[in-house]
UniProtKB/Swiss-Prot annotation:
Catalyzed reaction equations: malonyl-[ACP] + acetyl-CoA + H(+) = 3-oxobutanoyl-[ACP] + CO2 + CoA
Entry GO terms, CC: cytoplasm
Metabolic or biological pathway, per its Swiss-Prot or TrEMBL entry: Lipid metabolism; fatty acid biosynthesis
Sections of the chain in a coiled coil: none
Keywords recorded for this protein, A-Z: Acyltransferase, Cytoplasm, Fatty acid biosynthesis, Fatty acid metabolism, Lipid biosynthesis, Lipid metabolism, Multifunctional enzyme, Transferase
Matches recorded under SUPFAM superfamilies: Thiolase-like
GO biological process: fatty acid biosynthetic process
Summary of subunit composition and partner proteins: Homodimer.
InterPro entries: ACP_syn_III_C, ACP_syn_III_N, FabH, Thiolase-like
GO molecular function, one term: beta-ketoacyl-acyl-carrier-protein synthase III activity
Domain notes: The last Arg residue of the ACP-binding site is essential for the weak association between ACP/AcpP and FabH.
Gene name in the database record: fabH
Pfam families recorded: ACP_syn_III, ACP_syn_III_C
The protein's name in its UniProt record: Beta-ketoacyl-[acyl-carrier-protein] synthase III
Length: 325
């Protein structure tokens, strides 16, 4: 019998501290950095973001999102036989955030590991989980995107520090007799490492070099729109579907301009584009599952809808997952 995988539950979590653009601008002004709500909204579409408390880690956010997803799926943590966490801001150099999440959920024995593809991380992780389920290596997977990007922001650089936020999103992906994940398409091109990176490195327990995020926004924008369209079309082709078959486009929530440009290229009408970047900011690997959970809980996304998830991030990495919800 052919095995498939299907999302059976979604969940998310945002730290309580919400910072509007005006509040962030006021904080930055005390450090001599000028920005404004108008400047940020015009360039990014972002109006607010959430920052985790200093004693809260990515695994803490991940566990809360995971519990919500488990509840939505009608499952207990003990039912899970695979945990994959997509993150670029893990609690420790090692062990993985996934192992820490596993322990906090009170389970043991199942495989647990991290995937690091920055903002493409969730589509990478979902693709890996789908493959493991299809081969019979797992039956019920927790796939989580979790980030505390506030820890790696340079708050003297207004072009980057206003963009990002913290949060986590999760799905329960289960073996199914009917197709849920229809197709996926993943790519990377390492020659673009320098346009979006944290250039520091860890040696002897210390961070050497610059530990804060660096980004060439124009270069990222130029690359992102093209690769997002091509990856989405590749996933559609693998599933023998057309862009008109997409019920909802749920892209990585980085910048409203990139999202709208991609939707236009895919001929997805504005009302079918899921947007949460205005309230969440760019939460990297957490952004797609956060947006998915928000759209499910709001009633926009319904069972049977065809969803296109797509991400692009540092590396340069990009990819798409086409699924029937």
């Amino acid at each position: 019998m052919t095995r498939y995988s299907r999302i059976t539950g979604t969940g998310s979590y945002l730290p309580p501290r919400r910072l509007t653009n005006a509040e962030l601008a006021a904080e930055l002004a005390t450090k001599g950095v000028e920005t404004s709500d108008e400047w940020i909204v015009e360039r990014t579409g972002i109006r607010a973001r959430h920052f985790a408390a200093p004693d809260v880690s990515s695994s803490d956010l991940a566990v809360k999102a995971a519990r919500h997803a488990l509840e939505a799926a009608g499952r207990q943590a003990s039912d899970i036989d695979l945990i994959i966490v997509a993150t670029s801001t893990p609690d420790m150099v090692f062990p993985s955030a996934a192992c820490i999440v596993q322990n906090k959920l009170g389970i043991a024995g199942c495989p647990a590991f991290d995937v690091q593809a920055v903002c493409s991380g969730f589509v990478y992780a979902l693709t890996v989980a789908d493959a493991l389920i299809k081969t019979g290596s797992a039956t019920k997977a927790l796939v989580i995107g979790a980030e505390v990007f506030s820890r790696i922001l340079d708050f003297s650089d207004r072009t980057t520090c206003v963009l990002f936020g913290d949060g986590a999103g999760a799905v329960v992906l289960e073996a199914s007799e009917t197709p849920g994940i229809l197709a996926s398409d993943l790519h990377a091109d390492g020659k673009h490492v320098g346009i979006l990176c944290v250039p520091g490195n860890v040696s002897g327990g210390q961070v050497l070099g610059d530990p804060l995020l660096k980004m060439d926004g124009q270069a990222v924008f130029k690359l992102a729109v093209g690769v997002l369209e091509s990856s989405a079309r590749a996933a559609l082709a693998k599933a023998n579907l057309r862009d008109t078959d997409i019920d909802w486009l749920i892209p990585h929530q980085a910048n409203i301009r990139i999202m709208q440009s991609t939707a236009k290229k895919l001929k997805v009408p504005p009302e079918k584009l899921i947007v949460t970047v205005d309230e969440h900011g760019n939460t990297s690997a957490a952004s797609i599952p956060l947006a998915l959970d928000a759209s499910v809980r709001s009633g926009k996304v319904k069972k049977g809808d065809t969803l296109m998830l797509e991400g692009v991030g540092g590396g340069f990495t990009w990819g798409a997952v086409l699924l029937n919800y």
